[in-house]
Amino acid sequence: MEEILVFRTIIKHMEKKDVVGKIVDVIRTSFEQDGFKLKAPNKFEKRKGDSLYIYEISVTKSKTHFSLHLRLKLQNKRISTGVNTILKRVLKDPLIKYPTNFTDKVIEDIFKGRTSNKDVYGLTDWRFFKADEQTLSDFNAKFSIWFSNFETLEEKNNWQTELLQSVAYAKSWFALIDHDAYLIKHTDYVALYLLKKLDDIEGVEAKYKEIYDRKRSLDQDTEELELFYKYLLQEH
């Protein structure tokens, strides 16, 4: 009982910034050795050409514990601006119907949110790094800090080792995905935009069919996709 009270006292007096600070202290050197810089209290960033690599530490606090979620993001202004320019035309098209109970402000907020997104690709589920021959339980036993709850970081065995492993994973992920070919294979609107910029019209048509067929198989609406395809082909 005394131990529980001690933990609750610690949580009460610790803030999210304290947890973030401890994490930053562990991983900072490893990131800085590879050109990343701490650009915000919870974000390491590295610019490479037109791309921006982001490692984000998201911490939330409840009455009983902290929750940690590590996220990776790839931003590319050239690509996101191109996609968002087309998306603005799509979302203003009369064929796009919003629920009747949506106010003008809600619709405008949706429009702004959708068309100001700078992220080209991202990772939130770090089970991506599980080896094919590795069981999920084995992977989780060795690396689970990416999405975890705790009263203090210290209660989690090997928390520092796992954080350093997350840095290694992050670096390998950015090296893997920051290529047009990878993005074309693993994205939708970004892929269509990149193929159009490459003047690969056959590729655009094939990718569009792939996305369309997938959405139909999942019984998802295709109106927005069809409009994106239409306006994309009008781009010069």
Residue ranges and their predicted role:
Residues K39, K43-R47:
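Generic recognition of long tandem-repeat/solenoid scaffolds
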